[in-house]
């Protein structure tokens, strides 16, 4: 039996933000309930300002394939690297009173915290080979496969949802003991001595996830930075309008799902007044944030955000071909899943749905 005993921590408490799941327009976020789960309070909404013009051309309609395998890094990121002030500190993860023991029927561990069964953490056991030269991937690929497929001249940005959290979906929600172990095991799958830069939102559970991944990799120090653009509301244009849409669907997850897949019961009814265009806004994030800001800082980057942002971004990255339609089958983005952005030496870019655990989706 392995004891998951780690160092005590105070910085997460200091980083935790006062509950502020409000949109910047001042409209309160609908709290999550057992009758109507809400993803709107999973993270801090981003800016509700008008969609700024991208520095590169972006797809103009929902039918346009995202620049997955033919896109190139924007000129600005290829010629000028804007300095980023990272915080470098010791890797510190709290002792959650958890122990682990190997599973007997699958690869992974059984987690017990404070004497109570906390769940199983299963590893990816899909033996299908990953072909980095395939034209497109529309299903989730294990993070270890992608990491091990990288050539020395490749860069990769792993965009991941945080690990398992407490019930609170607002800024007070933190990782559970199971969540720390999930993230630690993801780190073990990409262990190595090469430096990784970590990016996270302003909400503490994303930094906690980064810390645990770094620990799993064998790091004693971590270089990280908080980025407001990762707070969760990147795709939201008018949060108050989005809240009005909740009356149309069984859950708020279904609102996001129908908008992201452009799949409505009544074609005359859309949610476009509340959300930006998926393809335009997704391409803008990839071009202006991932390729121009994050990727130039290190060969390998870990970016931890929230499902409110990464669910639609993953759908964008597969041109809506990924099967994750909550409004049909209740499937949702799993913890530690998202998108791997692989950048070749010649500037071509490939998007691959990535999973850190055994499955890329979960039922919500």
Regions found by a protein language model. Give the residues of each.
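Bacterial Sec-dependent N-terminal signal peptides
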Residues: 4, 9-91, 95-96, 101, ...
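Active-site-proximal alpha-helix that buttresses catalytic centers in soluble enzyme cores
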Residues: 119, 123-234, 268, 272-276, ...
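Low-complexity, serine/threonine/proline-enriched polar segments
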Residues: 223-274
């Amino acid at each position: 039996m392995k004891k998951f005993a780690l160092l005590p921590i105070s910085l997460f408490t200091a980083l935790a933000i006062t509950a502020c799941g409000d949109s910047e327009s001042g409209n309160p976020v609908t709290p999550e309930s057992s009758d109507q789960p809400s993803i709107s309070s999973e993270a801090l909404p981003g800016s509700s300002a008008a969609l700024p013009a991208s520095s590169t051309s972006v797809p103009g309609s929902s039918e346009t394939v995202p620049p997955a395998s033919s896109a190139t890094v924007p000129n600005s990121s290829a010629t000028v690297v804007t300095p980023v002030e990272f915080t470098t500190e010791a890797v510190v993860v709290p002792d959650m009173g958890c122990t682990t023991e190997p599973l007997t029927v699958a690869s992974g561990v059984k987690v017990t915290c404070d004497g109570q069964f906390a769940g199983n953490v299963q590893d990816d056991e899909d033996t299908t080979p990953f072909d980095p030269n395939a034209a497109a991937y529309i299903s989730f690929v294990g993070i270890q496969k992608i990491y091990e497929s990288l050539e020395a001249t490749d860069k990769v940005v792993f965009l991941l949802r945080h690990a398992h959290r407490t019930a609170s979906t607002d800024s007070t929600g933190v990782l559970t003991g199971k969540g720390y172990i999930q993230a630690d095991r993801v780190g073990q799958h990409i262990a190595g001595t090469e430096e990784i830069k970590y990016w996270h939102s302003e909400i503490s559970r994303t930094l906690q996830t980064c810390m645990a991944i770094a620990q799993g990799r064998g790091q004693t120090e971590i270089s990280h930075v908080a980025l407001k653009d990762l707070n969760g509301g990147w795709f939201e244009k008018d949060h108050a309008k989005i809240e009005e849409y909740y009356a149309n669907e069984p859950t708020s997850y279904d609102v996001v799902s129908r908008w992201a897949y452009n799949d409505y019961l009544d074609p005359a009814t859309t949610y476009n007044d509340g959300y930006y265009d998926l393809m335009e806004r997704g391409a803008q994030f990839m071009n202006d944030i991932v390729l121009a800001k994050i990727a130039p800082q290190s060969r390998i980057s870990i970016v931890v955000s929230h499902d409110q942002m990464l669910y639609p971004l993953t759908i964008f990255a597969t041109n809506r071909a990924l099967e994750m339609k909550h409004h049909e089958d209740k499937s949702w983005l799993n913890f530690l899943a998202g998108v791997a952005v692989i950048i070749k030496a010649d500037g071509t870019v490939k998007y691959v749905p990535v999973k850190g655990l055994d499955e890329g989706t979960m039922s919500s």
